[in-house]
């Protein structure tokens, strides 16, 4: 099985048994600089899909809103304090390991310098992105 087949991520063509899996809610931060570039980070070693590029963020904890989870995750992962988020879109993605709802939020304003607290790399990008591989569902 090729890497692309393994990482097929299309909720419109779900895998066998996908309907029985619970949906994992994930807050996703699309950090955008004034010049229009957006931030992608690489998944660190030890995590599923290590080395793949994605927007920063993470799973919602019980009782958290998308915004609360995003604020927490960006402190944990990047060491920044978000000033405000703007809910953007939702996307249901059928990964081999989980059925995931990505809750995208645009972030235009934050305090602090980026610190890669989980050993990940980062890159400011424009479309088409230059980093690879990119996790399906990201861009």
What does each model-identified segment do?
Residues 37-76:
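Conserved Nudix-box catalytic region and its N-terminal flanking loop in Nudix hydrolases
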Residues 20, 47, 60-65, 119, ...:
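Residues at secondary-structure transition points
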Residues 28, 51-54, 121:
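Residue-level recognition of specific faces of alpha-helices
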Residues 24, 33, 81, 89-114, ...:
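Active-site-adjacent beta-strand/loop module that shapes the phosphate/pyrophosphate-binding cleft
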Residues 77-84:
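Short secondary-structure junctions
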Residues 3-15, 86-88:
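Short Pro/Gly-enriched beta-strand edge/turn motifs at strand-loop
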């Amino acid at each position: 099985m090729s890497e692309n087949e393994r990482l097929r991520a299309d909720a419109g063509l779900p895998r066998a048994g996908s309907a029985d899996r619970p949906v994992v809610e994930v807050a996703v931060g699309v950090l955008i600089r004034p010049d229009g570039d957006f931030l992608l980070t690489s998944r660190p070693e030890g995590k599923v899909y290590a080395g793949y590029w994605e927007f920063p963020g993470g799973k919602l904890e019980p009782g958290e809103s998308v915004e609360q989870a995003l604020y927490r995750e960006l402190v944990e992962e990047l060491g920044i304090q978000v000033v405000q988020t703007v809910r953007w879109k939702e996307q249901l993605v059928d990964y081999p390991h989980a059925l995931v709802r990505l809750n995208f939020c645009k972030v235009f304003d934050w305090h602090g310098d980026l610190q890669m607290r989980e050993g990940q790399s980062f890159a400011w990008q424009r479309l088409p992105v230059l980093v690879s591989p990119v996790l399906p569902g990201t861009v």
